Amino acid sequence: MGMSFGVQAAETIKVGIMHSLSGTMAISETPLKDVALMTIDEINAKGGVLGKKLEPVVVDPASNWPLFAEKARQLLSQDKVAVVFGCWTSVSRKSVLPVFEELNGLLFYPVQYEGEEMSPNVFYTGAAPNQQAIPAVEYLMSEDGGAAKRFFLLGTDYVYPRTTNKILRAFLHSKGVEDKDIEEVYTPFGHSDYQTIVAN
């Protein structure tokens, strides 16, 4: 996947940073924007990439899933970035995926995800359930982990928790755990009263 002629001829290489700086997800995504900017500063201090400085282009999709797609299109079509570092939730990634595939852009996705998706336009840098959730459950089922026999699968009500819990439920079934020993509960984004859920 090469850069367009306009990007190659420029004095700088534009790098898109697309993380929510406002809304529900800002608490998780703002630090990723900060780390990306710090890394760009460090790279530029060492001479840049191929002798060119990196130029960050920061957008705020504001924890609004459809706005992620609009901002992705803006970064690729108008701002002409060479690459984008962005998203956090799976729903935001799924929102931008058609845009990156249509415009042949490149997205670096920074966190774990539910798997069951591949695209030549995305670097999935986080763990999938078989690398993270299943080993954790295997440990909990082991003697060292407490030999757990019952499982409470709690998550925010969106793609990642639901898909991961579907995978975990199938894994638990394969280990002989019955449905009566698996409970799933989903909460909306921004939910904070977990005491009531845990007490049940």
Which residues does each PLM region occupy?
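Short, low-complexity disordered leader/linker segments with a strong preference
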Residues: 1-14, 45
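Glycine/serine-rich loop-strand microenvironments at binding/catalytic pocket rims
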Residues: 9-27, 100-101, 106-110, 114-124, ...
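Signal peptide-proximal N-terminal region
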Residues: 10, 33-56, 146, 173-180
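Short beta-strand segments enriched in small/hydrophobic residues
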Residues: 12-31, 87-88, 150-156
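Sec/Tat-exported extracytoplasmic proteins
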Residues: 22-25, 39-40, 44-47, 76-79, ...
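Beta-alpha junction/loop-to-helix N-cap segments that form part of ligand/metal-binding clefts
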Residues: 27-34, 47-116, 125, 187-195
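Core alpha-helical elements of the protein kinase catalytic domain
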Residues: 34-37, 41, 73, 138, ...
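Extracellular/periplasmic Venus flytrap/periplasmic-binding protein
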Residues: 70, 121-200
